[in-house]
């Protein structure tokens, strides 16, 4: 199984930062993605960064990289996670109240939703109310916790794929947690546990 970790955006993407500029999403995504790949490799998994560059590689190119791997190994032998930080409307450069962790798949039920369930299970164990944290679930869905959206990186790739929104870069409490050593490791650990448990339980 090839595990591809995508780090959203790039150094040249406008905006995408906390209002005080301390957190820049492209950098944070890359730090989390690199730590996750490192820990996956330490556990013996075949994991790679999808975008080693600092620049914002176009989504068409990102999807092509994933699908090339799917064509080589088979789409059932590739797994994709796209790492992002969330932001609340309006895009006014200010702090907002929305908080929490969430994950997205495409519309309808696919293997990506099965994968997302394992990520949510891991998130609910770590991002607890006792820590002052929250996990955002799609409450209108009867069987699924993840949100659904037609994000290009999910819609145009052939393998199971989930996009995670790792808290809000425009919420002061979330940013404080995200930038803490404990917060960083928690976010990496949730992805690591979710990936491992999915791979251990997936139907062959």
Model-predicted regions and their roles:
Residues 1-65, 89, 97-99, 128:
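Active-site histidine-acidic residue metal-binding/catalytic motifs
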Residues 23-31, 56-60, 109-114, 178-189:
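Soluble non-cytosolic domains of exported or imported proteins
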Residues 59-76, 151-156:
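Mature extracellular/periplasmic domains of secretome proteins
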Residues 3-6, 17, 23, 82, ...:
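Active-site-adjacent mobile loop/cap segments within catalytic or ligand-binding domains
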Residues 33, 37, 60-63, 100, ...:
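Extracytoplasmic/secreted envelope proteins and their assembly/folding machinery
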Residues 34-45, 67-71, 120-128, 183, ...:
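Sec-exported extracytoplasmic/periplasmic mature domains
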């Amino acid at each position: 199984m090839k595990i591809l970790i995508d780090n959203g955006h790039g150094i040249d993407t406008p905006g995408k930062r906390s209002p005080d500029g301390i957190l820049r999403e492209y950098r944070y995504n890359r730090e989390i993605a690199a730590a996750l790949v490192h820990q996956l490799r330490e556990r013996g998994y075949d994991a790679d960064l999808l975008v080693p560059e600092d620049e914002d590689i176009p989504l068409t190119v990102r999807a092509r990289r994933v699908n090339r791997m799917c064509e080589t190994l088979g789409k059932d032998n590739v797994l994709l996670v796209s790492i992002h930080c969330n932001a609340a409307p309006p895009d006014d450069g200010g702090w907002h109240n929305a908080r929490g962790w969430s994950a997205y798949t495409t519309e309808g039920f696919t293997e990506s939703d099965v994968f997302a369930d394992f990520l949510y299970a891991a998130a609910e164990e770590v991002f607890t109310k006792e820590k002052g944290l929250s996990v955002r679930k799609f409450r209108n869905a009867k069987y699924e916790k993840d949100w659904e959206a037609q994000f290009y990186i999910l819609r145009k790739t052939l393998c199971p794929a989930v996009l995670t929104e790792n808290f809000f870069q425009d919420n002061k409490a979330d940013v404080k947690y995200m930038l803490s050593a404990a917060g960083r490791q928690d976010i990496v650990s949730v992805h690591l546990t979710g990936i491992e448990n999915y791979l251990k339980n997936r139907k062959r």
